[in-house]
Amino acid sequence: MSKADKTLEKILSATADANIRFDDVISLMPRLGFHLRIRGSHHIFTRPGIEVLIDLQPVHGKCKPYQVRQIRDVLIKFNIAL
């Protein structure tokens, strides 16, 4: 199981939203078909066919819990997987 698989599993399990590393999510999102745009500390992910923007900012090397929930909601709603 790769690191991306483990990160995706953590996100989808909804048990560790406050404990997911920012760098792991940043490397996972392009593998899921998202495109990255950086504006200051904001890492903005878009994907063709999805109107929702995913805007992430690091806090002490981790993702904010509400942003992890946003990622999970988008992945489930649009049936996105590795």
Question: Residues of each region from the PLM?
Answer:
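C-terminal structural segments of small proteins and small subunits
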Residues: 59-82
